């Protein structure tokens, strides 16, 4: 079998068109969804991500503001900027681009953003609501993954899901969201013994470790759905995922490519959360 490609670009495009309509509806009621992004330093990957966020937000008719600071910015100064946006009704979402310089506490920054404007879904209050299955801002990449899985029309209930990776940004929350969909979830990580024994049982395999071509075809169950979250740049300059794509696509039933799989959904779900936050101001 050759796997059906799960087209993240196409799914993101459909979702963005829907969001653009919702933005127009909100504007008609006097609310312009606003996203404020804070970028510290000049890490090329971060600059690229922020550029993508700006383009997406403006294409959907949202207000976008970027505050760029030198990496000498102190933690106290950053927290003051966050406080100003927390109080500013023109902005419904606040995002501080990670990673941060070593002298700034990621925890302090995440906890300073108002839970009502935490469109990344990282604030402990929103993480707690996610664990409880309550309505909240879901983390963007995990939420995007669930949306892509739903496009396959496969019933997630009762499926064996294996998540390789346990980061707070992707691994842990995507497992929780799939548990909320009644899947049976196993986590694998750097201390897991005999990882292949677990991955070969997976009906749905989600890989988010940041290691190029880490998972090979012989670790994948025949007919599995494979979601590859990794984005790695090879010495040749070519981008690849955490899964050996050419091999895996001959074994899986569905697979996400890199690039063009999970990535486009992340920014789309960020826009979704910003629109959701703007809509809340009406109620």
Curated annotation (Swiss-Prot):
EC number: 1.5.1.5, 3.5.4.9
Keyword Amino-acid biosynthesis: yes
GO molecular function, a single term: methenyltetrahydrofolate cyclohydrolase activity
Record-listed NADP(+) binding positions: 165-167, 190, 231
Catalyzed reactions per annotation: (6R)-5,10-methylene-5,6,7,8-tetrahydrofolate + NADP(+) = (6R)-5,10-methenyltetrahydrofolate + NADPH; (6R)-5,10-methenyltetrahydrofolate + H2O = (6R)-10-formyltetrahydrofolate + H(+)
InterPro entries, alphabetized: Aminoacid_DH-like_N_sf (IPR046346), NAD(P)-bd_dom_sf (IPR036291), THF_DH/CycHdrlase (IPR000672), THF_DH/CycHdrlase_cat_dom (IPR020630), THF_DH/CycHdrlase_CS (IPR020867), THF_DH/CycHdrlase_NAD-bd_dom (IPR020631)
GO CC terms: cytosol
Keywords: Amino-acid biosynthesis, Histidine biosynthesis, Hydrolase, Methionine biosynthesis, Multifunctional enzyme, NADP, One-carbon metabolism, Oxidoreductase, Purine biosynthesis
Pfam families: THF_DHG_CYH, THF_DHG_CYH_C
GO BP: L-histidine biosynthetic process; methionine biosynthetic process; purine nucleotide biosynthetic process; tetrahydrofolate interconversion
Annotated pathway: One-carbon metabolism; tetrahydrofolate interconversion
Family: Belongs to the tetrahydrofolate dehydrogenase/cyclohydrolase family.
Assembly and oligomerization: Homodimer.
PANTHER family: C-1-TETRAHYDROFOLATE SYNTHASE, CYTOPLASMIC, C-1-TETRAHYDROFOLATE SYNTHASE, CYTOPLASMIC-RELATED
UniProt cross-references to NCBIfam families, sorted A to Z: PRK10792.1, PRK14186.1
Function field: Catalyzes the oxidation of 5,10-methylenetetrahydrofolate to 5,10-methenyltetrahydrofolate and then the hydrolysis of 5,10-methenyltetrahydrofolate to 10-formyltetrahydrofolate.
Protein name: Bifunctional protein FolD
Organism encoding this protein: Bacillus velezensis (strain DSM 23117 / BGSC 10A6 / LMG 26770 / FZB42)
Encoding gene (name): folD
């Amino acid at each position: 079998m050759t796997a059906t490609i799960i087209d993240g670009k196409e799914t993101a495009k459909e979702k963005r068109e829907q969001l653009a309509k919702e933005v127009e509806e909100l504007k008609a009621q006097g609310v312009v969804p606003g996203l404020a992004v804070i970028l510290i330093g000049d890490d090329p990957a971060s600059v690229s991500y922020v550029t993508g966020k700006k383009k997406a937000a403006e294409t959907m008719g949202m207000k976008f503001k970027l505050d760029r600071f030198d990496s000498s910015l102190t933690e106290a100064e950053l927290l003051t900027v966050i406080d100003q946006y927390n109080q500013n009704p023109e902005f419904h979402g606040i995002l501080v681009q990670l990673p941060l310089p070593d002298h700034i506490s990621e925890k302090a920054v995440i906890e300073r953003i108002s839970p009502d404007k935490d469109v990344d879904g990282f604030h402990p209050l929103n993480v707690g609501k996610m664990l409880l299955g309550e309505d909240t801002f879901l983390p963007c990449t995990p939420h995007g993954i669930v949306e892509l899985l739903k496009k396959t029309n496969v019933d997630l209930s009762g499926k064996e899901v294996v998540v390789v990776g346990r980061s707070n940004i992707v691994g842990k929350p995507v497992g929780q969201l799939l548990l909320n969909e009644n899947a049976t979830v196993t986590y694998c990580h750097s201390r897991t013994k005999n990882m292949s024994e677990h991955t070969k049982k997976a009906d749905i395999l989600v890989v988010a470790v940041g290691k190029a071509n880490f998972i090979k075809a012989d670790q994948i169950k025949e007919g599995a759905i494979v979601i590859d979250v990794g984005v790695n740049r090879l010495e040749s300059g070519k981008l690849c995922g955490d899964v050996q794509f050419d091999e895996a696509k001959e074994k899986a039933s569905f697979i996400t490519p890199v690039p063009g799989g999970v990535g486009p959904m992340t920014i789309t779900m960020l826009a979704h959360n910003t629109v959701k936050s703007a809509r809340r101001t009406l109620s």
